[in-house]
Amino acid sequence: MSKIIGIDLGTTNSCVTVLEGDEPKVIQNPEGSRTTPSVVAFKNGETQVGEVAKRQAITNPNTVQSIKRHMGTDYKVDIEGKSYTPQEISAMILQNLKNTAESYLGEKVDKAVITVPAYFNDAERQATKDAGKIAGLEVERIINEPTAAALAYGLDKTDKDEKVLVFDLGGGTFDVSILELGDGVFEVLSTAGDNKLGGDDFDQVIIDYLVAEFKKENGVDLSQDKMALQRLKDAAEKAKKDLSGVSQTQISLPFISAGENGPLHLEVNLTRSKFEELSDSLIRRTMEPTRQAMKDAGLTNSDIDEVILVGGSTRIPAVQEAVKKEIGKEPNKGVNPDEVVAMGAAIQGGVITGDVKDVVLLDVTPLSLGIEILGGRMNTLIERNTTIPTSKSQIYSTAVDNQPSVDVHVLQGERPMAADNKTLGRFQLTDIPPAERGKPQIEVTFDIDKNGIVNVTAKDLGTNKEQRITIQSSSSLSDEEIDRMVKDAEVNAEADKKRREEVDLRNEADSLVFQVEKTLTDLGENIGEEDKKSAEEKKDALKTALEGQDIEDIKSKKEELEKVIQELSAKVYEQAAQQQQQAQGANAGQNNDSTVEDAEFNEVKDDDKK
C-alpha cells in the first residue's frame, strides 16, 4: 500500500509528516522549515504558497491568510476578477504540502490523513475533505487535532493507563479534549472548544493597542491604512512570540505613516505584563470549554494524569499559567506544539496501512445532532461526545391529518430551539399515504462515519419508501464543482511550473550574459578579435531575446552563447597551457647551462678537527 502522509492544516501554519518505520517524521519544506505558513498569494497570474507568499503580504493586497476560519461557510475571496472558495485556497496549501512530501519520498503521493479542530462541525469537516480532493488527495481519514496529539504523545506509552487532557490553542481555533489511554486504545471521553479563538486574536489585541497608542500620539488612525495594518500584524505576531521569552520588547516601525510635518514612526515598548492585561479576556475564554470538557467526562482535576499543550499559542506564559492553575498540574512540555498534531496524523496513516499495530482510536462527535419537531424545538438523536462511528434511529409521525410529506430539518448544536442551532441540511420524504395525524411511522436514522461526517435517512415504515442524504451544507461543493476545481488545480499547477521554469531560464540567461561580459573584459587582449566578435554577437542576440516573450528563442540563444563561451574557454586554457610549457622549457634550459666554473676547496686535516 502506498504511503499515507499526515497533514496538520493549520490556520497560521501547516505541517506534513510521514511514517518511517514506526516513527513519524516531519518533512521539511524547500526553504528548510518544518512548518509552512498557511498563506496564499496571487501575483501576475502566478500562485505563491507559504513563506514566499507571507514575505510579500505587506505589498501585495492579493494575499490570503487564515482561510481556515472560513471553512464550511459560503465566504468567497475575490482575486484578480475570479472568486475562490475556502476549499480552493486550502487546496493550494495542501497541494504545496503534497509536493513537499513527493520531493522527499521520491514517489507520487495521493493519500492523506488531515487533522481538523475537534469542534469543527459537519460543514467544516466536509469542506476540509473537499479541499483534499481538489488538491489531488484521497482523504483516508479526518482526525481531530487533540486526538492526533494524544496519539503522538501516547504511542510509546501503550502499556500505561492514563487520562490525558489536551489543550489545543492554535492560530484560529481552540479545542480541549480528554482522552483515556491504555492497552493501545485511545478513547476520547469528551471534547469542547471555540472555533473563533486563537493566536490571531492575541495578535489583534496587540494591533488594537498599537493603533490606539499611535492615534493618541499622532492623531492618525492606522486601522484605515491596509499596508500599515499588514506591517502592524507582522510586528504584533513577532512581539507576541518575543514576549514568550523576554519580559519586554521594542516595536519599531519607521515611516508607518505621514503627517503634515513629514513621515511618522511608530515606537512602542510592550511589556509582558501589558500583553497579559490586553489578552486576559481571551485566556479566560479558554477556561469555560476546559471546565465543560471535564464535566462531560465526569472527571475531577485529580483524575488527570497529564496535560498536553498543543498549538503555537500555548507558548504564551500566561496561557500555560492559566492551564496549570485550572487543572492543578504542570503541563507536559515534552512535545513540540507545532508538530505533534501532524505527527499524530502520520501515525493514524500507519494504523490504516497496517504499519502501526495494536492501536485503536475511538473518537467522538463534538456537537449534538437532531431534527426539528413540532413547535420549532430540536429533538436530539445523538448526544455530543458520543463515540464514532455511530448510528441512532427514532420513530416520528405526522403533525396533521392526511399529511402527504414530512420535511426533515437536520440540526447540530446544544440549544433547545431549532432556530438557535446550525442547520446541516433539509430534505423531504414524500408520497406518504393519507392517514390520521400520528398514525404514519417515519423512522429517522442518523449515521456518523469515522470522519465525523453525517448521513441521514428517513423511511416510511408503512410503504418502506426511503429518502437518504449525505449532509450538504450551503457551503459544500457538488461533485461537479469539485471535479472542475481539481482540473483547475492541475492546470494551475502546470501553469505555475511553466512560469517557474521561465523565470529560472531568464535568470540563468541573464546571469550568463553578465558572466560573458565579465569574462571578455578580464581576458582583454588574450583572445583573438574574431572569437571576441563571435561571443559579442551571441551575447547581444541573447539580450535581445530576453526582451521578448519567446521562451524557445531565449533557450536556443542561451545554448548558442554557452557553446561559444565553452569553445572560447577551451582556447584560453590551451593558450595558457602552451605559455606555461614554454616558460617551464626556458627555466629548464637555464638549469642545464654547459658552462662549468672551477671551485676552490680547502683540505681540512684531522688534527685541525680536534
From Swiss-Prot:
Signal peptide bounds: none
Amino acid composition bias (Low complexity), ranges on this chain: 578-592
Post-translational modification Phosphothreonine, affected residues: 173
Keywords attached to this entry: ATP-binding, Chaperone, Nucleotide-binding, Phosphoprotein, Stress response
Induction note: By stress conditions e.g. heat shock.
Disulfide-linked positions: none
Chaperone as UniProt keyword: yes
SUPFAM superfamilies: Actin-like ATPase domain (SSF53067), Heat shock protein 70kD (HSP70), C-terminal subdomain (SSF100934), Heat shock protein 70kD (HSP70), peptide-binding domain (SSF100920)
Annotated family: Belongs to the heat shock protein 70 family.
General function of this protein: Acts as a chaperone.
NCBIfam families membership: PRK00290.1, prok_dnaK
Protein name from the UniProt record: Chaperone protein DnaK
Gene symbol of the encoding locus: dnaK
